[in-house]
Amino acid sequence: MGSESLETLQVILSGGEFMLHTSVWLVPGSLLSSHPVFTFKVKQENNGPTFWRRKVSRTLNESSLRSQQESSTPFKDPTSHPSDLKELSPAGQGTSRPLPTLSSCQSMAATDMPVCSLSLASSTNEPQELPDPRDAPREGSFRLDGNQSEFGLGNSLPASPLHSCRNLEKEESELHLYIISATSSIFLHLKSSWNNYIIRATLLQDPLCASEHNDVIGKPKPYRSEEKIKHFCQLKSELFLKDNTLRKILCLITELRVAAQRNFILKRLFWKTSELFYFLVNKLHEYLPESRDKHALQNKSQRADELMACIEIIQTLGLMFRETEIESSRLNTLAAKKGTLFNLLVILISKPKVPKSCSKSDAQPVADPTSAEVFFDSQLQKLTLEYTDTATALLYEILLIFQQGNLGLGSTKFAISWMMSFLQSCPPIMAFVARIVEGVVRGLSASFQLLTPCQAVLLYQQFYILRSCLQHSKALAEYIRNDHREEFRYFIHMPALEQRLPGCYPITEPTTQLCHEVLQLIEQKQCAKC
C-alpha cells in the first residue's frame, strides 16, 4: 500500500494520557479480507463528550461496505485535534487532552481478523485540566483476538443504572483503523502505550504516587531545556568521578531518578549518552551477585549499603526503560553492545549473596533479638526480597523489548524465543523463576488484605514473566509444571486472585487475563500427559 493511500496515526503517551491526532487508515477494499480491523469509537452527548464503554460486533462484509462508502464520500473526523479542544470546552473552562478508555471487542465472525474499539472522551463536569487519577474512569478494556496476537488490557466495573440510562442519550461516531500487520510498529506502539497507561493509572491510585504526580504536573517547571541538559551533564560527570564513595553514588543516582521523573528530557538524554547506561550496569556488576570487596562478605552493614545502592540503580534503569519505546536512541544503545544488556539479564536473575546469618549456631544459643547482628540479618532479608521485586520489574521492561522484536533480531517470535533461550542457558534462572512463583504465592495467600497498587502492578509483571516462560521456553515450562505443581494447585488460582485484587484498579482485568492464561498453559500440558 502506498504512502499516499493512508493518513498516519499517532498515539503517544504523555503525562499518563493519550493524545490522539488524525486517526484513520484508508485501506483498499481488496486488503480487507486478510487484515485485522480496529474500530475507534467516539460518543458525545449534547453537553460534551463523556466516558463510555460498549461491545462492538460487526461482520466483515458490513465493515468492508462501510469502508467503501466512507472512501467515496468526504470523511468528517468526529474527534478534534488537541489544539481544537478549546472549542469543545464549555465557557470558562480550559483545554485538555481527552483521556481514552478502551471498550471490549469481539472477533469478527467471518474471519480470524480482530476488531477492537476505543472510546475516547473526557469529563466535562469539572474544569478541563489533567484529571486526578483517583477520579479517572474505572472501566475500559483493550482486547485483540487473533492468531498469536491476543491480549487483554484494562478494567471494567458494572455500570450503574443511571450510567446505563445516560448512555441511551449519546450519539455514536466510528473511526475505523485497518491494521495491515499485527507486527507493525504503529500497532506495537499502540499496545505498548495502552499498557503504559494502565500501569501508570494503577500506580497513581497509591496516595504517595498520586501526590508526587500532582506535585510534578501542578507546579510550573523550574528549568528550561538548557538547564535540564546542564543538570544532566553535571550529574553524569559527578558519577564518573573515580574517588566517589558508595554513599555519594547512591545520592547522585537518586537525584538522577527524581529528576527523570519530573522531566522526560532526562530519559532522552540518558539513552542518547549511552555511557551512563553502561556505567550503571558495570556498577551493578561490582556488587552483584557478590561484592568485589571481600570485606563486604563478612560486614553485614556494608553489604546492606551495597544492596540499597543496587536497588536504587535498578529502579533508575526501570524508570529509564518505562515509556521510552519510541526513543530510537534507546534501541541504538541496547543494540550497540548487546553484551551489556545480556550481562544485565544475568545480574537481574541472580540472587544477591549476603553474609551468613549469625542468629543461630551449633555451639551457641539463639542470639539476643536486640543485637546488631539480628537487626542486620533481618535488614538483609528484606533487602533481598526488595531486590527480587525490583529486578522483576526491570526484567519485565526488557522482556517487552524482545517481545516487540525491537533489537533487530528478526521477527517478534524469534526475538522473544532468542531471549528465553539465552535465559534458560543461565544457571540462576531456575532459582529466579522459583522466587517469582514464591512472590505470587506470597501476594495471593496469607492475610486477606487487598493488594496495594504497587503490589498489583508487581503481580501483573510476575504473571507476564511466567507466561513468557511457559510459552517460549520448553525447559522453563517443564520446570514450572513439575516443580511448582502444588503452588498452582493450592495457592495460585482465580478465587484467590479475585479476593486480593481490587476491582477498581485498571490493571485488574489484564492481570486476571494473564493469570487465566498461565493456568491454562499449565493445565493443557497436564491434560496432554493424561
From Swiss-Prot:
Record field: compositional bias (Basic and acidic residues): 131-142
Q: Which InterPro entries did the record assign?
A: DUF4551 (IPR027878)
Residue ranges, compositional bias (Polar residues):
60-74, 92-103
Q: Where is this region: Disordered?
A: 60-103, 121-155
Signal peptide residues on this chain, from the entry's feature table:
none
Show the coiled coil region(s). Answer: none
- Please report the name of this protein according to its UniProt entry: Uncharacterized protein C12orf56 homolog
- Organism the protein comes from: Mus musculus (Mouse)
